[in-house]
Amino acid sequence: VIECSQEVEIVGEVKQVIVIRKYYPDGKGGIKTLRRGKEIAQGCHASIAWLSEKVRHGSKLTKDEEAWIQGAFTKICVCVNSEEDLLEVYQKALDAGLTAKMITDAGRTEFDGIPTRTCLAIGPNKSEEIDKVTGELKLY
């Protein structure tokens, strides 16, 4: 069980950014997009991946994570066009010391059995730190 402190001093805004990949190879030399429900499910997986890992390992929450859980659960969805773009944002987040979780779909319903990177979540961390990595990405 993960416990939060009774009160958390919030210094600055804390948020999570979900980065969704828009385009995928269709296997015929073209591109395709995901069904809207599939995109939403992938974003949900990303949003809770960090917390699931904390629970499995019995890790304590950071102050930013506690503030996010006790606050408004602020989430922003942005998009990138390709797997390469997704990997670039992921690496920038890791290099900046941010919480970042990549989601790879197993391929059972959309990708003919091929595991495929679909999205990632960055944070919860301080907004100004996340903005350094995602501030130029388009809202989705």
Question: Could you describe each region identified by the protein language model?
Answer:
Residues E84-Q91:
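Short amphipathic alpha-helices within nucleic acid-binding modules
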Residues K22-D26, S82, P124:
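A generic structural motif
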Residues A49-E53, H57-F73, C79-E83:
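Compact, glycine-rich, soluble single-domain proteins
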Residues C44-S47, Y90, T134:
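A generic alpha-helix structural signal
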Residues E3, E53-D64, G97-G107:
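Short amphipathic beta-strand starts and helix->beta connectors
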Residues K38, Q42, N81-E84, E128:
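Conserved active-site and cofactor/substrate-binding residues in soluble primary-metabolism enzymes
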Residues S5, E9-H57, E66:
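Glycine- and Gly-Pro-enriched alpha-helical subdomains that act as flexible
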Residues V17, I69-N81, L94-Y140:
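Short basic, glycine-rich beta-strand/loop surfaces that mediate nucleic-acid
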